[in-house]
C-alpha cells in the first residue's frame, strides 16, 4: 500500500513540467521528480535552487549518455569527467553548430533547385519564337536560280517578249480577210475579168467581187418562179433553170497554195 509521500511524488512526476521552483527541499526528496525533468527544465530549477548543483551530476551524466551517446563513442576515457553539466553544454553547442551548417547548405541547395525550376519552367507565349518554328520548304528553283538582279532581268525580258508576241498575233488576226461569195446568175466572163483585175495576195484569202448593179432581186424572183413553177397536164416536160458553166465558180486548186496550212 502506497504512502502519502509516494502518491505525492507520482503526481509531481506527471506534472513536472509545471513545477517552476522547489525551494529549499532536500535533493533526496525531490530526486525522483528531477529525474523526469528535461535538461532545459533542470537548468532552470538549478538556477532557482543552487544547492542542487552539487548533487545533480549523476542526472547530467544520464542526459549526456542518452542524447550524445554516438559522439561519446569516440572518447576512450569517460571516468575522469567531473563536470557532466559542462560537457552536456559543449556537446549541445557543437551539435547546434552542425545543425546550422547543415541547414544553411540545405537552404542554398533548395534555392538553387528553385532557380533551376524557374529557368526550366514552361511559359506560354503569344507567338511562337522564330528559332522554334519549322524551317520553310525551299522553292523548286531556289537552289538553281537564287533571287538576284539576273532573275529580275530575265523576268522582264520574258514579259517584253510575251507582250510583243501578243501584239503580232492580234495584228495578224485583224488584217486577215475572208472570201466573198459570188451571187448566183453571174457570168463566167465577168468573174474571170474581176479575178484578173484584183490579184490575190499571199497573206489573205481570195476575195469575190460584188454583184453588178443591174443584178437585182428580180433575177432571184424569176429564178425561184421558174424553179417552183408547177407542172401542167398539157406539157409533159418540167421547165428547169438555165445551167451555169463550171468556170463561173472559183477553182479550189488555185487557193490551196495560198491558204495557210493548219498546224
From Swiss-Prot:
Entry's Gene Ontology cellular component terms: elongin complex
Gene3D superfamilies, alphabetized: 6.10.250.3180
Record-linked InterPro entries: Elongin-A_domain, RNA_pol_II_trans_fac_SIII_A
Signal peptide residues on this chain, from the entry's feature table: none
Domain of life per record: Eukaryota
Biased composition (Low complexity): 230-245
Region (Disordered): 112-147, 170-263
UniProt record, GO biological process: transcription elongation by RNA polymerase II; transcription initiation at RNA polymerase II promoter
Coiled coil: none
Alphabetized GO MF terms: transcription elongation factor activity
Polar residues: bias regions: 186-206, 214-229, 253-263
Purpose of the protein: As part of the CRL3 E3 ubiquitin ligase complex; polyubiquitylates monoubiquitylated RNA polymerase II subunit rpb1 to trigger its proteolysis; plays a role in global genomic repair.
Family label: Belongs to the ELA1 family.
Oligomer status and interactors: Heterodimer with elc1. Component of a CRL3 E3 ubiquitin ligase complex consisting of a cullin, the linker protein elc1, the substrate receptor pof4/ela1, and the RING protein rbx1. Interacts with skp1.
Protein's name in the database: Elongin-A
UniProt organism field: Schizosaccharomyces pombe (strain 972 / ATCC 24843)
Chain's gene name: pof4
